[in-house]
Amino acid sequence: ILFHDSGYRCLKHFYLEKVCRHLRHLFPKIVSYNRFVELEKEVAVPLALFIKKVLLGKCTGISFVDSTPLRVCRNQRIHIHKVFKGIAQRGKCSMGWFFGFKLHLRCNEKGELLNFMITPGDVDDRKPLEYKAFVEFIYGKLVADKGYIGKNLFRRMFVDGIQLITKLKSNMKGALMSVSDKLLLRKRAIIETVNDELKNIAQVEHSRHRSFDNFIVNILGAIAAYCMFPKKPCINVQRTFDTQLALF
């Protein structure tokens, strides 16, 4: 977690130059770098539980959902890639084709992560919303892009008390949208900013992985580091509490 918030771009340099030299008082039983890499996978489950139970935020009635690609190699090296062979898949995003995984995220208007899910690159963006574990403890409005449009998905989430808000396509006749929903769609860039900070600051994506276990630990460490950021992207939302609701 400390590495993802340190500014270092290489874990080996951070461990040898920072931890081994200046943080020995915090880690008296320090091990070699090779042994440290071998021990990483043992903290995957405790780290995931720590994120789920402690670090994630709470739903406030306004949530945003999006997915971002996690490339594991360049497209030219797909056929000779061995580390994630049989696990990673080809997918397509707004930037084109890629080979790797997708990181699905939910956040509130404060920039706090509410939940996350990792899937192969060829999984539809709407698929995680079908899993109860991904949309639990969520209510109110859920803002997404056009990739989440679907009649069955909208009806299913509406029954669960969730209003899915997406941009309208040109062939969607008779669809109306309130002014407040249009304003929320304009603010959907907040989750794009979250994705940007995860990739450029927390380094959730890089192509130097040598095992699938350490790939998962790297993602969990980046998410944990982001949750601990003192300043997160947020939008100013003013809520009006109507006393007429008390009549019902």
Role assignments for model-derived ranges:
Residues 1-248:
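Short alpha-helical elements
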